[in-house]
Design a protein with these regions (language model features):
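Short glycine-rich, polar/acidic loop-and-turn segments at beta strand-coil junctions
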Residues: 11-13, 54-59
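Short conserved catalytic/interaction loops centered on acidic-Pro-aromatic/His motifs
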Residues: 177, 190-192
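Short, conserved secondary-structure transition motifs
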Residues: 186-189, 228
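Beta-strand elements within well-structured catalytic alpha/beta cores of enzymes
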Residues: 48-54, 144, 175-183
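Glycine/proline-rich loop-helix segments at beta-alpha junctions forming the active-site rim
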Residues: 149, 163-166, 186
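Short, internal active-site loops enriched in acidic
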Residues: 56-59, 183-187
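Non-transmembrane, aqueous-exposed alpha-helical and coiled segments at domain scale
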Residues: 164-171, 175-177
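Flexible, D/E/H-enriched segments
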Residues: 1-48, 63-160, 172, 193-275
Length: 275
């Protein structure tokens, strides 16, 4: 049945770990409401598995071994790797979809070199989204990582090719598959600038992404992204891959820069997948 849903959302640890510290609880709750809507949209699509394209934070890979792309093919995944009290998410086991993941990996490998892992430890980059999108952790999950942490980073044109390859792989399957890309827009995690958000930059990027303006999307330069959107801005790769996989235009359902305690521009959007 192929890809039945594609969307994006933010994943900063403060979204769950510092929820009680948000000064504007009205905006916080509106953000949460749109995350709930995203969960319901995924459920309504009939998705049997969920691919999560994320940017992990040295939970599984470090500078001694940093693949550009990796897919989790294990029967189960564990998380969060961080302290549960800090993240406000209990440690749990998440079901995988190994047979489907292997089929997807074999297909993607015809276009993009792809590493794989049978043992995946989920950090906040996956656990925060899952805590909203499958709070009972009963939907099989296939994690995918794009290196957004340790330069040299994979080129954006290659990210687009990865997204297109993943879509082709999904369309070859009989299962109904949902896909979300999760990362920051502008954010400066673990720095003195933590909490800073470049709203103008975010909105410009999101407008280009929703309109599938491939030329502009692929014209971003890492050095400029770093200056305008922080080191967390490199995570636009997860969102770009999702847009490429979807193929259709997007709908920005929620964006706010008014929750600095979350230290990220809070975003929820979905794309037309052409079904």
């Amino acid at each position: 049945m192929s890809l039945v849903y594609a969307g994006i959302l933010s994943h900063a640890p403060g979204i769950t770990g510092r929820a009680h510290l948000a000064l504007d609880k009205t905006i916080r709750d509106e953000f949460y409401a749109y995350l709930t809507k995203q969960r319901k949209d995924i459920e309504s699509s009939g998705a049997e598995s969920l691919i999560v394209i994320a940017a992990e934070h040295f939970a599984n890979f470090f500078m001694d071994n940093m693949p550009a792309y990796c897919i989790g093919i294990g029967e189960k995944h564990t998380g969060p790797i961080e302290d549960s009290e800090w993240l406000k998410i209990e440690k749990t086991t998440i079901p995988g979809a190994p047979e489907l993941a292997i089929r997807l990996a074999k297909s993607v490998m015809h276009s993009v070199d792809l590493a794989y892992s049978e043992e995946w430890q989920c950090d906040h980059g996956i656990m925060v989204p899952l805590s909203f999108l499958t709070p009972n952790y009963d939907l099989p999950v296939i994690p995918c990582n794009i290196n957004c942490q340790g330069p040299p980073l994979t080129p954006l044109a290659r990210v687009w090719q990865f997204g297109e390859a993943l879509r082709r792989a999904c369309d070859e399957q009989s299962e109904k598959i949902a896909l979300v890309g999760t990362g920051g827009i502008s954010h400066w995690p673990a720095t003195p600038d933590s909490g800073k958000i470049n709203e103008a930059w975010d909105r410009n990027f999101l407008d280009q992404l929703m309109n599938q303006d491939k030329t502009k999307i692929l014209s971003y330069i890492d050095e400029e992204v770093y200056q305008e959107a922080g080191q967390g801005g490199f995570e636009i790769r997860t969102l770009i891959a999702t847009a490429a996989a979807a193929g259709g235009k997007g709908e920005l359902q929620f964006y706010s820069a008014e929750l600095p305690i979350f230290a990220v521009g809070c975003t929820v959007a979905r794309f037309d997948v052409g079904q």
